[in-house]
A protein has these predicted regions:
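Secondary-structure junction motif
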Residues: 147-148, 177-181, 189-211, 279-288, ...
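Interdomain hinge and pocket-entrance segments immediately C-terminal to HTH DNA-binding domains
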Residues: 53, 83-102, 116-120, 164-166, ...
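Hydrophobic hinge/microswitch elements
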Residues: 128-141, 147, 197-256
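A short LG(V/I)-centered, amphipathic sequence patch enriched
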Residues: 40-59
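Short helix-boundary/capping micro-motifs
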Residues: 10-31
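C-terminal effector-binding regulatory domain of bacterial HTH transcription factors
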Residues: 202, 229, 243-256, 262-306
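Central regulatory/effector-binding core of bacterial HTH transcription factors
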Residues: 90-151
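Flexible hinge/capping segments at coil-to-helix
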Residues: 156-191, 195-196, 274
Length: 306
């Protein structure tokens, strides 16, 4: 089995066809076909089902790709780590960040990171755990920073608490309920949530129930944070978001918090990464920059392993 064959299989799996994979790899399509056929003969199994509109993995192919992706990621990391330890500034860092992490930790980290590693490609994924779990396991994602999930990470991953968090209610500036001071005052409001926040609808409903209030009326459910912000700025909708959103200057002219008296808890912000394997120097530097910029008012613990 050759390294190039693993690379070829992963490329086809990611792009869904020989033609697209060959274009991505800058290979002739017959050469790519020959590479896959040779590997399938060596393994004695079909890795793909050939269809008119492309190729899909067989169950055995899916298992192979999981392992091959991890190997490719480790080779990339090894190459990056050696170069960076030797004083080089090239490579790639892939970080999965929640909205709270984007707003609270990323802004202060970007400039010093780019100054230290100007040629490292930084790939930022907006998401949350556990949707990023597969990438963390196979090494295609270096680390995650975002809300702690109710389920503990997989055994091969390690979790570190960065800070405790809270939420706020926000709406457009000039909102009719801008002077509300309790959730009860907001009982008749209409709400919006976004699917990029884990369990947003469920947590909003549970919060109202805890205070003896009927479930809030969910009028708009968006697939992106941008859609939600546009909806908020152009309607009387409300939403509940991490308190870090108040630090996002581009929103301040259009949206404002509604300071209700109730404490609105939010999941702790954590980082998740693979256990037993060090990050590359560039990835570790970025994560350390984020640690240094943890909100000072937060109850932070010093790098425990959970």
């Amino acid at each position: 089995m050759k390294f190039s064959q693993m690379r070829d299989v992963v490329a086809i799996a990611e792009r869904g066809s020989l033609r697209a994979a060959a274009r991505h790899l800058s290979l002739a399509q017959p050469a790519l076909t020959r590479s896959i056929h040779e590997l399938e003969r060596e393994l004695g199994i079909p890795l793909f089902e050939r269809r008119a509109r492309g190729m899909i993995l067989t169950p055995m192919g899916e298992a192979f790709v999981r392992r091959a992706s991890a190997v490719l990621s480790e080779v990339r990391r090894a190459r990056d780590e050696v170069e960076q330890l030797h004083g080089g500034t090239r490579g790639r860092v892939v970080a999965g960040l929640s909205l709270a992490a984007h707003v609270a930790l990323l802004p202060a980290a970007l400039k010093p990171f780019r100054a230290r590693y100007p040629q490292v490609q930084l790939h930022l994924i907006e998401g949350w755990y556990p949707t990023l779990e597969a990438g963390l396991k196979d090494g295609s994602v270096d680390f995650y920073v975002g809300p702690q999930h109710e389920r503990s990470p997989a055994p091969e991953l390690t979790q570190e608490l960065l800070f405790e968090n809270t939420r706020i209610v926000i709406g457009r500036r000039g909102h009719p309920l801008a002077h509300a001071r309790s959730l009860r005052d907001l009982a008749d409001a209409e709400w919006t949530t976004t699917s990029v926040t884990f369990k947003a609808e469920e947590e909003l409903r549970e919060l109202f129930e805890q205070h003896g209030l009927p479930a809030p009326r969910l009028a708009v459910q968006s697939q992106s944070a941008l859609t939600m912000m546009v909806a908020l700025a152009n309607s009387d909708l409300l939403t509940m978001v991490p308190v870090q959103w108040t630090q996002f200057t581009p929103l301040s002219h259009a949206l404002a918090p509604i300071p209700v008296e109730e404490i609105l808890p939010a999941p702790s912000i954590v980082t998740v990464r693979r256990a037993g394997l060090p990050l590359t120097p560039a990835a570790e530097f970025l994560l350390d920059l984020m640690r240094r910029n943890v909100p000072r008012t937060s109850a932070r613990k010093q790098r425990p392993s959970i």
